[in-house]
Amino acid sequence: MFPFRVIDQASVKQLLDMKHVIELVERAYTLKEQKEASLFPMVFHEFAPGKADMDIKSGHLTGADIFGLKLVSWFGENPAKDLPALVGFVMVLDSNTGVPKGMMSGEPVTLMRTGAAGGIGAKYFARPESENLLLVGSGHLAAYEIMATLITMKHIKKVTVYNANSYEKAATFCATAKEKLQEMFLAPYRDDQELYRTLLDRIEIEYVATDDIRQATEEADIIITATPSHKPIIMKEWVKPGTHFSCIGADMAGKQEIDENLFTTARVFVDDVTQAINVGETKVAVQKGLISKEDIVAEIGSVILGRTPGRLSDQDITIYDSTGIALQDLITADYILKKAEERELGTVAQL
């Protein structure tokens, strides 16, 4: 028999803070680059096309002595049964023994690590003095993408939010953005007053909704796309030199958020080359022959380690295609398990 810890959603949220998650996700990227982490093939299955599906992302972090998986299912008719449409969990196992260490609610892990990825993309590829952030999408990920970027980019003065389907939703988000960001993310830093005040000051900026995506694109220094779109929202001719894109939404075949022609003039970076050309934002550009796999400059871990330069000049357009990899989930989940054990949170069963 061995102990197996199960951690509910509330406890997961209690144990995570964005600054630490950014550090964890960066470490996952660098472990992958150093061949101390690897991904297993994705599993995707539709139970009923357009109505119910599931996917499994898994991997092995030899540098952290863990392996595991994240399973996410989507059953579109669940809300009518008083059940969530999206359900997920992360399981972590010891790679030296194969013994499961624990599992937890997947939603807060996914939201935090996905937000972190967008902010990390800005950190390594955007111009350091960037002031204007455009967020395309005002859904569940919006606050996470903004907070991570405010942590990694200290000169942001304005956040513009665009929702392709509803200006009202973008406006509603912006109206309460400052309060929401403070409530969701600042509590863990109250014991570090200097950091708390720094982040509070970064949150106290301008938040503006827009229904003019062309103008917003023309003005943006950093653009984060976090939508389920299946067609381009941003066109190449709108993008000024020096713009950085963190593309978050395209995580399966068929999704697309930016004009594929942007890839012909941009420096392109990804979290995982195989995933990017098969399910990511990069897929369409490769599929249409606009670029090849070899045109991808590097995976982000190489840039973090200083092996590959990111931006070469202030005029470069940079694209970071973040498809989302299991290593992000696993390294975050392992951190949660360690913290939960310290604080005696969760339920421990003997298996």
Feature annotation, model-predicted:
Residues 1-111, 117-119, 126-129, 327-330, ...:
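N-terminal ligand-binding/catalytic initiation module
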Residues 10-13, 251-351:
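Adenosine-phosphate binding glycine-rich loop
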Residues 17-21, 26-35, 123-127, 151-154, ...:
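Generic secondary-structure signature for well-ordered alpha-helical cores
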Residues 125-132, 240-241:
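Short helix-loop-beta connector
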Residues 152-200:
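NAD(P)-binding Rossmann-fold cofactor-contacting core
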